Curated annotation (Swiss-Prot):
Region annotated Disordered, chain positions: 186-206
Keyword Secreted: no
Keyword tags: Ribonucleoprotein, Ribosomal protein
An annotated GO BP: translation
Keyword Ribosomal protein set for record: yes
Naturally occurring in which organism (per UniProt): Arabidopsis thaliana
Organism phylogeny: Eukaryota, Viridiplantae, Streptophyta, Embryophyta, Tracheophyta
Source organism superkingdom: Eukaryota
Entry-linked Pfam families: Ribosomal_L13e (PF01294)
PANTHER family: 60S RIBOSOMAL PROTEIN L13, LARGE RIBOSOMAL SUBUNIT PROTEIN EL13
GO function terms (MF aspect): structural constituent of ribosome
Name this polypeptide is given: Large ribosomal subunit protein eL13x
UniProt GO cellular component terms: cytosolic large ribosomal subunit; cytosolic ribosome; plastid
Family that this chain belongs to: Belongs to the eukaryotic ribosomal protein eL13 family.
Amino acid sequence: MKHNNVIPSSHFRKHWQNYVKTWFNQPARKTRRRVARQKKAVKIFPRPTSGPLRPVVHGQTLKYNMKVRAGKGFTLEELKVAGIPKKLAPTIGISVDHRRKNRSLEGLQSNVQRLKTYKAKLVVFPRRSRQVKAGDSTPEELANATQVQGDYMPIASVKAAMELVKLTADLKAFKAYDKIRLERTNARHAGARAKRAAEAEKEEKK
């Protein structure tokens, strides 16, 4: 025994052998899942195996909001700017989320660009081989098309490059905490000072 921990006393009574959890089905379950993935890939051909295209979103809360991840679906505004009708989007492998709202121009533009890149690479098979409609791909593109396995257009988190500066005498003399306190005080008294200045100006005019 080490450290100030509780001395373990195993409470093995009440026919504990009957309550032992076993995992003997794990290898077979792994095989079943693999076979199911292969069957699904054949069934949804020529669509990508990893499902529809998802937008790039920031995680919620202070802990995760600096990280980007895949969201549920593109907003109606993003689809509108990209020039894709909202009824057409789910039929060509683009997920739509009518609840999500765009709260920044940067996020909107990045997802619109993502949609445009996807649309440029997209190969659309006709519903019926003999009836080719507007928007369907050419026979040459259809002949060369392959099913995308795994993730496509992966979301990569880009880290901002830090710029190193030389430490000068001014930087060494700068008191960061004092500066923060001063600015906080100025912000707190800003309203009262502005009011006092306005009253003084009014007195001068008299």
